[in-house]
Structures are given as structure tokens and as C-alpha cells.
């Protein structure tokens, strides 16, 4: 039996703040997400979900928050380096913490990192065009 990745989720403190961030990032978060404790979004063949700590505690009451360093990195691909740079400027302009300003990792790959409202690192990536 082949193993397949089915879901990736983020446990959030405040659904309103999380939904707002991920919408600004470009994720098609449902319009009623703020009134929910768990929302699922189908993306690129898998399901991305946001779930409140309160909802998660029902399934895993002994779980405690991680501390220090990365808990998870979510990578979202943008089609151009200009789109990556613009998205980084947009998100940091709204007050989200820019963890790492846009930079070229290799001659063909560009990265930037922004922290979501819960401190999860979101990696933005794009291919760099060769002229």
C-alpha cells in the first residue's frame, strides 16, 4: 500500500486572525470560517485545515504547545519572483512578522518567510527566471 499525504493542518489560537492571514496569503478560506472551530480547504490534491486549540483539545487533551524553533513550515509557491516579493510586502504591510525578507536561495529559486498569527512559519517560494 502506497502512503499518500492527505491533510496538512494548522492549530490556531484565534480563527478570525488565522482566516484573515491565510486569505491575505491567497488561500480560499470559506467566508464563514470565523464562526467555525474547524475549516477544511481543498488545495492541489490535499486538504489544508485550520482548527482551533479548543477543538483540537477534544481530540488530544494532553497536547501542549511546542516552544522554541520551528514547529512546522508551510511552503506556498508563487508563479513569479515579482509575485513573491509583492506578497511578502503585502503581508508585512499588514503587520505580519517578516521572518526572512525575499532572497535568492540559488540562481533559480527565491524564498521569503512570514510568520502567521500563531507563530507558524510560512515559506513563500518562486522560480527565478533566467534572462
Regions picked out by a protein language model, each given a short descriptive name:
Residues 18-23, 91, 119:
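Conserved active-site tyrosine of GNAT-family acetyltransferases
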Residues 9:
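Polyanion-binding surface elements
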Residues 121-124:
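Short glycine-/small-residue motifs
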Residues 1-6, 28-81, 85-115, 126-131:
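Vicinal oxygen chelate
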Residues 16-17, 86:
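Alpha-helical macromolecular-interaction surfaces
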